[in-house]
Amino acid sequence: MNENSSRYKRVRGVDKFMTGVFYGIGGFFILLLIVLAAYIIVKGITSIYPGVFSFTSMGIGNQFFNTIYLVFLSLIISVPLGVAAGSYLAEYAKKGRLTEMITMSIEALSSLPSIVVGLFGYLVFILMTGMKWNLLAGAMAVTILSLPTITTTTRDALAALPAHYRSGSIGLGATRWQTLWHVLLPACVPRIITGVILVAGRGFGEAAALLYTSGQSTVLNWANWDITSPTCPLNVFRPGETLSLHIWVMRTEGSMNPHSVEIANVSSMVLIIMVLGFSLLARYLSRKLDEKNKGAAK
C-alpha cells in the first residue's frame, strides 16, 4: 500500500512538473509575441511624421494598397486550387504511386525557400512572357508558396470528418460531388480558414519572392481608373511594391530619402498590425462558423 502510494505521489509530481513546463513554454512564446509586437508598434508610433500615411513618395499608402491587393489576388488563385486539390486527394484519389508522388511533391513544394520561388517566378512569369515586373506575377509566386498549406489543410480536414457524414449523405441519395459540396466542405470551413490565415500572413510578409516578380516601384494615379493604364491602381500588370519590400528598400537603398528609417519603422508597425488583425478576425469567423456547424449537427 505504501509502495503504491509513493508511486502515485511520484507520478503526480512528474505530471505537475511537466504540466508546469508546458505552461511555461506556451507562456514564453506568448510573451515573446507580445514583446516583439509591442516593440515594433512603439517604434512605429514614435516614428510617425506628417504625411507618412499619404499616397505619395514620402508615404506608405501606395505600398499598403499593393500589399492588400496582391494578397487578395493570390488568395483568389490559391484558395480554389488548394481546396480542389485537397478534396481530390481526400475523396477521389486512390492509394498508389501517383497519389504518393503528388503528396511528396506537395511536401517538397512547401519546403522550397521563397527566394527560389521568386527566381522561378522571374524566369516563368517575367522572362518567358516578355512582361515587366507586375502584381500578377507576384501573386502567382505567392500562390506557389500558398498552395501546399491550403491543400494539406483541406485534405487533413476532410480526412478527419466522421464517416457518418459521408454514409448519411450518400444513404439519402446524394452523389459523391453533392456530398462533398453540400456536407463535407461546409463542415471543414473553420479549418480551411485557418489555412487561409497562414497563407495570407505569409503573403503579407513575403519579400524575397516578390523582389523578382512584383518589382520595387509604384507609380499610381488615383484619379485614373482605366484598368489598362500602367498607373491605374487596379491594373494587375503594373509593378507594385509591397510593405515588406518597402521596408527592405528603405533599410538598404533608402539613404536618399530623409525619412527612410521612419518609413521602415511605420511600415513594420502597419504590417504587424495587419497580420495580427487579420488573424484575429479570421479566428473569430472560424469559431463562429464552427459553432454554427455544431449547432446544425445537433
Model-predicted regions and their roles:
Residues 3-24, 40-76, 95, 249-261:
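Periplasmic/extracellular loop-to-transmembrane helix junction in inner-membrane transport proteins
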Residues 74-106, 127, 282-291:
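Transmembrane-helix boundary motif in ABC transporter permease subunits
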Residues 154, 176-216:
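Transmembrane alpha-helices
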Residues 15, 81, 93-103, 162, ...:
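Amphipathic cytosolic juxtamembrane alpha-helices at the membrane-cytosol interface
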Residues 65, 69-77, 81, 85, ...:
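Hydrophobic alpha-helical transmembrane segments of multipass integral membrane proteins
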